[in-house]
Amino acid sequence: VALLRAVLGDGDLHGRLRAMKRYFLLDKGDFLVHFTDNAGEELARRAPDISVSRLQSLLELSLKLSTASTDPHNDDLTCSLERQGIIHQLLSIHVTGGAKGYAPADADLDLDENAAQMTPKEALRLTGFETFALDYNAPWPVSLVLSRRAITKYQLLFRHVFHCKHVERRLCEAWQTHQATRAAAAQTTGAGDGGSLGRAYVLSQRMLHFLQNFTYYLMCEVVEPNWHAFETALRDAQSVDELVDAHERFLDACMKE
């Protein structure tokens, strides 16, 4: 009971969990907009050429300029660059026996270790957008709930949502470019949306529409319902073990859905 009080009271577990939702699940993603605007040029470079310390400085600046500036625990948020893309990271987890909680137990996957490893050439081609991840330094006793295993799941969820947001941003930039190109084409040929230019515009709009709906599904149909169930379980928890179990169920549900 004393440990439970320490986790919930002095450790401010509820506040830290809300922070994890804000940062890793982009519940309030205004800080990410600031960060992408400031760090976009750096993230577009090849991963080996990126300065992580510069990214960390830009992340801290973005937090100060966003609604997260009032979070007393935002100093515990850091960033890193993973050594592989998210697909290969998930494959590595599955192959090495860490797939429990990430994939159905009866998943029909016949993989070997070579399939899960990136070649050196593939790794060199990765950009910062493909390898960027957040990290969180949870102090004792909150680290009992926000364990390294739990934070790894948060990182996987973040990388997935971050990639969706990045692609959405690029599609919006493509739309802006298309507007300028269409205007130039109309002046020179007298045609606006005909031919291949029109088909490219329609395709980009369909892609953008799909991605926006997919992101909405992730946040409103997956994260929010599971989060509400998780909050109920937190209020009813009578021990730290029950807190950990409820947290793991929340993360596993988000990963699977």
Give the predicted meaning of each segment.
Residues V1-E257:
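Extended, charged interaction scaffolds in large complex subunits
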